[in-house]
């Protein structure tokens, strides 16, 4: 078990390479053109800033400068 204490980082690298290869393999399986052709419509974005839109602090354009 002395080798495990010395070379644990190699096992981590092998694990990360395996994860990376599986991700690449899975991403190649995705057909993005088919998804984009059949993607669902998104509902309109609702934010809660709509009540603040009326409270505009910017000066009006038609007001003369003081």
UniProtKB/Swiss-Prot annotation:
One of its GO terms (cellular component) is plasma membrane. It is a single-pass membrane protein. Keywords: Cell membrane, Membrane, Transmembrane, Transmembrane helix. Residues 42-51 have a biased composition (Basic and acidic residues). InterPro entries: UPF0370. Its main location: membrane. It comes from the Bacteria. The chain crosses the membrane at residues 4-24. It is found in: Cell membrane. Residues 39-66 are annotated as: Disordered. NCBIfam families: PRK13664.1 (NF010185). Belongs to the UPF0370 family. This is UPF0370 protein YpfN. It comes from Salmonella typhimurium (strain LT2 / SGSC1412 / ATCC 700720). The gene is ypfN.
